[in-house]
Swiss-Prot record:
Disulfide bonds: none
Any single biological process term in GO: translation
Ribosomal protein as UniProt keyword: yes
Name assigned to this protein: Small ribosomal subunit protein uS12
Alphabetical list of CDD domains matching this protein: Ribosomal_S12
Classification via Pfam families: Ribosom_S12_S23
Stated family: Belongs to the universal ribosomal protein uS12 family.
Amino acid sequence: MPTINQLVRKGRRKVRTKSKSPALDGNPFRRGVCVQVMTRTPKKPNSAIRKVAKVRLTNGNEVISYIPDEGHNLQEHSIVLVRGGRVKDLPGVRYHIVRGTLDATGVEKRRRSRSKYGVKRPKAAK
C-alpha cells in the first residue's frame, strides 16, 4: 500500500487494455484484397459450413474474416472492407467483411436488418 507522498510523486500505473482486433491498427475499418475464399467448420456443439476469406489488408497484415449471411460473390482478388468483430464458434476468426461495399454485394432478398447486410430499401409493392 503506497503512502500519499508516494502517490503524489509517482501516481498509479494505468492498466493497458489489449485490442481485440489488432490488425486494424485502431481504425474502425480496413480495405483489403481476398487472398483465398474458403469454408470452415465451427467448434463442438455447432455444426455448419461457414464461409470465410483470408484477406491481405492495406497495412500488410493477413487476417481471416467471416462473410456474413447466405450467398456471396467473393473470390480471389476481390477488394473488401474489413471490420472488427469475432465469430464465437470459429477459432481464429476475429474480423467481419462488410457487405454492400466495394466488391462485396449486399444480401439478396433481405427484408429485415438491411443496414447490416448492405441492402437498399425495397420499392413499395403496389
